[in-house]
């Protein structure tokens, strides 16, 4: 299997995404399946992140030789793309008709929880657009919810973008704060409390007090609550936008 660090490593004229390529025909029964390989990769990614994922280590975890993985997953980039789709959440289920906002929030919260649980996804989604079957099913379900709620283009497209941009961006922010706190050897609240005085000294005088107060408030609120409150603000804005003429 070829390990690559860049994204565009395929032969000229060959689709860059593994989802856009055909599947090799299996001439003989293989001892491994692609599903087994991907699940094992997800476990290693959860333990050590993208930078520490090694194909040799993956093969050892499966009691196989590294080259035996090549038949199923040609490159490490392909494996990472498959891993992102493997852990993508189930599509949001539609609840009581007319309650579209609850369904939208359920879809966003499900994705947010998965991104926090598998923080490596956030890094990969910057170079591996989620276009696998599970990701498309999730997006398709959200589109149907919005359509049935009466959203039409261009408002529908704007609402869809807002949902995913906010969710991924919020998860990125939370993970970065948690990572910094872990690296400092402190919990998130203690680290944020120490950050307050630095903000007061560094920020523009007119902004320092407000920024410092915000940092301290953020340290005492839960990750889920911060996300939920922001999501509520966004959904209320979407409700107003829904009534605008297309």
Curated annotation (Swiss-Prot):
Q: Which UniProt keywords apply?
A: Activator, DNA-binding, Repressor, Transcription, Transcription regulation
Is Phosphoprotein one of the keywords UniProt gives this record? Answer: no
What do we know about what induces or represses this protein's expression?
Negatively autoregulated.
Annotated knockout phenotype: Deletion of the gene results in increased lincomycin A (Lin-A) production, but delayed mycelium formation and sporulation on solid media.
**Is Ubl conjugation a UniProt keyword of this protein?**
no
Q: Which GO terms describe its biological process?
A: negative regulation of DNA-templated transcription; response to antibiotic
Q: Which residues bind DNA?
A: 54-73
Q: How is its activity regulated?
A: Activity is regulated by the effector molecule D-arabinose, which binds to AbrT and reduces its binding affinity to the abrT-SLCG_1980 intergenic region.
Q: Transmembrane ranges?
A: none
According to the UniProt entry, its GO molecular function terms are: DNA-binding transcription factor activity; transcription cis-regulatory region binding
Matching InterPro entries? Homeodomain-like_sf (IPR009057), HTH-type_TetR-like_transc_reg (IPR050109), HTH_TetR (IPR001647), Repressor_TetR_C (IPR004111), Tet_transcr_reg_TetR (IPR003012), Tet_transcr_reg_TetR-rel_C_sf (IPR036271)
Output the Gene3D superfamilies linked to this UniProt entry: Homeodomain-like, Tetracycline Repressor, domain 2
Q: Which residues form the HTH tetR-type domain?
A: 31-91
What PROSITE patterns does the database record attribute to this sequence? HTH_TETR_2
Function noted in UniProt: Transcriptional regulator that plays a pivotal role in regulating lincomycin production and morphological development in S.lincolnensis. Exhibits opposing regulatory effects, directly or indirectly repressing the expression of lincomycin biosynthetic (lin) cluster genes and directly activating the expression of the morphological developmental genes amfC, whiB and ftsZ. Binds to two motifs present in the bidirectional promoter between abrT and SLCG_1980, which encodes an arabinose efflux permease, leading to the repression of the genes.
This chain belongs to the protein called HTH-type transcriptional regulator AbrT
């Amino acid at each position: 299997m070829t390990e690559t660090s860049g994204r565009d490593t395929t032969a000229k004229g060959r689709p860059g995404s593994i989802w856009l390529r055909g599947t090799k025909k299996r001439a003989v029964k293989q001892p491994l399946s692609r599903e087994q390989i991907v699940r094992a990769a997800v476990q290693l990614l959860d333990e050590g992140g993208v930078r520490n994922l090694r194909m040799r280590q993956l093969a050892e975890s499966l009691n196989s030789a590294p080259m035996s993985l090549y038949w199923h997953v040609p490159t490490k980039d392909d494996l990472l793309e498959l891993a992102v789709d493997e852990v993508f959440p189930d599509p949001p289920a539609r609840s009581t008709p007319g309650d579209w906002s609850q369904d939208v929030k359920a879809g966003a919260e499900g994705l947010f929880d998965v991104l926090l649980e598998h923080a490596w996804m956030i890094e990969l989604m910057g170079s591996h657009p989620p276009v696998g079957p599970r990701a498309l099913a999730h997006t398709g379900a959200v589109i149907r919810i919005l359509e049935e709620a009466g959203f039409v283009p261009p408002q529908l497209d704007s609402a869809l973008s807002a949902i995913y941009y906010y969710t991924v961006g919020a998860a990125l922010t939370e993970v970065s704060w948690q990572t910094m706190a872990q690296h400092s050897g402190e919990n998130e609240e203690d680290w944020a409390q120490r950050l307050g005085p630095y903000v007061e000294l560094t920020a523009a005088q007119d902004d320092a007090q407000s920024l410092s107060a915000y940092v301290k408030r953020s340290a005492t609120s839960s990750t889920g609550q911060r996300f939920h409150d922001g999501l509520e603000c966004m959904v209320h804005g979407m409700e107003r936008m829904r009534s605008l003429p297309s």
